[in-house]
Design a protein with these regions (language model features):
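A generic structural signal for well-ordered coil/turn residues at beta-strand boundaries
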Residues: 1, 42, 83, 106-108, ...
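N-terminal lobe of the biotin/lipoate ligase/transferase fold
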Residues: 1-58
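Short acidic (Asp/Glu) patches
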Residues: 15, 25-35, 63-68, 75, ...
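A generic local secondary-structure boundary/capping motif
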Residues: 18-19, 38, 85, 95-103
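Contiguous, small/hydrophobic- and glycine-enriched helical/loop subdomains that border
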Residues: 45-85
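Long, positively charged amphipathic alpha-helical accessory segments at protein N-termini or as interdomain linkers
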Residues: 68, 75-76, 95, 103-182
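Beta-rich nucleic-acid/ligand-interaction surfaces
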Residues: 81-98, 182
Length: 182
């Protein structure tokens, strides 16, 4: 999608965004049904979603993020799970994840920064001071990374998206493919 900011279900929108920058750049701000933190979307960001039956492991974020980590390993990128819902490369975040539960289903979704404009993200979102306690990191730019910066063989975002889809179908034959339309 074009640039937008998506805030979590329980967030105070004004405490998450740089309102002046948002207004100056006509960036839409929307609220999603799931929790989690505010995210900046642009054309360099890929979103993924898993919908599964809600069982004892529904809140296990590792269950849904492990396929992303394993895919990146095939590209010689060492990614890791961190905290409750983040994925990191070399200590820098490239993915945040959230979940929404309804009846007997869970929708797990995440962002993948592939070739996002980090400076735009940094300008659009406010960073909580607590994220910096005890750290010498001075900006969002120093704490996040794009997957494309770690690829041994360059590819564009469409090639990477196709790689994700192919990988999921090869590694899990139970996956169903849905094409959404208007």
């Amino acid at each position: 999608n074009e640039s937008s900011v998506i805030v979590g279900k329980n967030q105070n929108t004004l405490s998450e965004i740089n309102l002046d920058y948002i207004k100056e750049n006509s960036i839409p701000v929307v609220r999603r049904q799931s929790g989690g933190g505010a995210v900046f979307h642009d054309l360099g960001n890929i979103n993924f979603t898993f919908i599964a039956s809600n069982n004892d492991n529904f809140s296990d974020f590792k269950r849904f993020t492990t396929p992303i980590i394993e895919l990146l390993k095939t590209l010689d990128i060492n990614a890791e799970f961190s905290g409750r819902n983040d994925l990191l490369i070399n200590g820098c975040k490239f993915s945040g994840n959230a979940q929404y539960n309804y009846k007997n289903k869970v929708m797990h979704h995440g962002t993948l920064l592939f070739s996002s404009q980090i400076s735009d993200m940094s300008n659009a979102l406010k960073v909580k001071p607590i994220k910096f306690e005890g750290k010498s990191i001075k900006s969002v730019k120093a704490r996040v990374t794009n997957i494309s910066e770690h690829l041994k063989v360059p590819m564009d975002i469409l090639e990477f998206k196709d790689l994700i889809i192919d990988y999921f179908y090869k590694t899990n034959t139970d996956n169903k493919y849905y094409t959404l339309s208007e």
